[in-house]
Amino acid sequence: MRPRPVIGDPVRRRCGRAWVLLVLAGMLACGDPDRAIEARLTESERAIFMRGRSVAVPCWTCHDLAGTVDKVGPSLAGVFGRRSGTAPDQQGSEAMLAASIVWDERTLAAFLMDPSGFVPGNRMVSPGVGDPEMLRALLFYLRHVSQPGARDAEPD
């Protein structure tokens, strides 16, 4: 019977380093899906975009941008110009269908500030984005990443 390795022994340290390198290599290979978008932005726009990206992190719990992942909320791909409750492959709530809102900068801002107040009875559980600068950044980010193919385009 072999003795259990002690934390810090040379074998475990080598394996640990290899694991970290493997994870880092994988991350580098995948790249940043927003790189093509960022390349087209000015420096000040990039700052707003990155802030919006941070604000959007909780959104990805229920939503996606590809429309291929089965999530609780609708895909946000192509959300601008779409009517509420009509996302492809998603059964919209009765409240969203009845509201029949066309999503644009103004309607998304009002909804994201107070989801249950703007569309009573909808299923979104977010309390809303109360900070105007955070909301502005989130909308800027969504405007850019939700366009079909936006993340696929190569920078000029």
Task: State where each predicted segment sits.
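Gly/Gly-Pro-rich "capping" loops immediately C-terminal to redox-active cysteine motifs
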Residues: 49, 66-102, 126
